[in-house]
Amino acid sequence: MVKWSKTELTIINDIFSHLDYDDIGPKALSRCLIVYPWTQRHFSGFGNLYNAEAIIGNANVAAHGIKVLHGLDRGLKNMDNIVDAYAELSTLHSEKLHVDPDNFKLLSDCITIVLAAKLGKAFTAETQAAFQKFMAVVVSALGKQYH
């Protein structure tokens, strides 16, 4: 079980209370698909992913980015038991979708980068530490079924 300080919980809750899901989600998933093109294989049904412009303008990518970002709400609501909160999604991604668990870390990094760009100076080292700790726990939970 992960131990969260009051400061970490405050920072994480503050980030999510101001998060623009419709902006951050599409940008983060688009970045992941552009920077790590091999991740596109899981999105073959999304239509044109031929280049960066097509990915950024793809409505399916945008919608899934929003869905993924809202998926983090599950962890936020279950900070004391994130692993169990993501057990079903871990099984889905490992057994049905066959997603390489390393892709969770790649997307996590992209979410962090987009969030940092959005928050600017407000994305302090302390904010980054708390957010990346949260994301690392979520990534670990999503990869749990693979172990």
From Swiss-Prot:
Tissue specificity annotation: Red blood cells.
GO cellular component assignments: blood microparticle; haptoglobin-hemoglobin complex; hemoglobin complex
A GO biological-process term: hydrogen peroxide catabolic process
Gene3D superfamilies in alphabetical order: Globins
GO terms of molecular function: haptoglobin binding; heme binding; metal ion binding; organic acid binding; oxygen binding; oxygen carrier activity; peroxidase activity
InterPro entries (alphabetical): Globin, Globin-like_sf, Globin/Proto, Hemoglobin_b, Hemoglobin_oxygen_transport
PROSITE patterns assigned: GLOBIN
Keywords linked to the UniProt accession: Heme, Iron, Metal-binding, Oxygen transport, Transport
Pfam families: Globin
List of residues binding heme b: 64, 93
SUPFAM superfamilies (UniProt xref): Globin-like
Sequence ranges assigned to domain Globin in this UniProt record: 3-147
Leftover remarks: This fish has two hemoglobins: Hb1 (major) and Hb2 (about 5% of the total). They display the Bohr and root effects.
Subunit structure and binding partners: Hb1 is a heterotetramer of two alpha chains and two beta-1 chains.
Physiological role: Involved in oxygen transport from gills to the various peripheral tissues.
UniProt similarity note: Belongs to the globin family.
UniProt name for this protein: Hemoglobin subunit beta-1
Source organism: Cygnodraco mawsoni (Antarctic dragonfish)
